Amino acid sequence: MTTLKEMYEKEIVPGLKETFGYKNPMEVPKLDKIVLNIGLGEAINNVKLLDSAVEDLALIAGQRPVITKAKKSIAAFKLREGMPIGCMVTLRREKMYDFLLKLINITLPRVRDFRGISGKAFDGHGNYSLGIKEHIIFPEIDFDQTDSIKGLNVSIVTTAKTDKEGKELLKQFGMPFKN
């Protein structure tokens, strides 16, 4: 099986050049990075939740996450500036393509009642954001070892200038859009 990077260079670039009329292959949109983020508001009271989230995200991404801290104090949430409230990982190059392949072919089909992902979650500049309600759909996570089910944000950043270009790029990679 070819990797997504090889597929991009051999099939997707010529297809997008034809579809959008690009003259230069460097104009064709490409994946820039994939950012995985787990935000845990409950980590204010229970620091062990954050430790388990860091371990789970490291298993999912294949690299160590960075702990994110609160930028501002919010009294209503009993939150102080600098408190740890989540973790994130930025994937680039080979790990990015490996993660996308795993997401499309293994993880998303494991979602209960899966009929495709929404095609409306683009930001206006060709970047796509996907919310995953249960992180246990990833094959690396052992359901019995997990203390709680966490949500996960996946942001796919592309060099596309418009949502139409970004959606077509992800569709060519095999992203299962329902609309």
From Swiss-Prot:
Keywords: Ribonucleoprotein, Ribosomal protein, RNA-binding, rRNA-binding, tRNA-binding. The keyword Thylakoid does not apply. Signal peptide: none annotated. GO terms for molecular function: rRNA binding; structural constituent of ribosome; tRNA binding. PROSITE patterns: RIBOSOMAL_L5. GO terms for cellular component: ribonucleoprotein complex; ribosome. GO terms for biological process: translation. This is one of the proteins that bind and probably mediate the attachment of the 5S RNA into the large ribosomal subunit, where it forms part of the central protuberance. In the 70S ribosome it contacts protein S13 of the 30S subunit (bridge B1b), connecting the 2 subunits; this bridge is implicated in subunit movement. Contacts the P site tRNA; the 5S rRNA and some of its associated proteins might help stabilize positioning of ribosome-bound tRNAs. Belongs to the universal ribosomal protein uL5 family. Part of the 50S ribosomal subunit; part of the 5S rRNA/L5/L18/L25 subcomplex. Contacts the 5S rRNA and the P site tRNA. Forms a bridge to the 30S subunit in the 70S ribosome. PANTHER family: 60S RIBOSOMAL PROTEIN L11-RELATED. This is Large ribosomal subunit protein uL5.
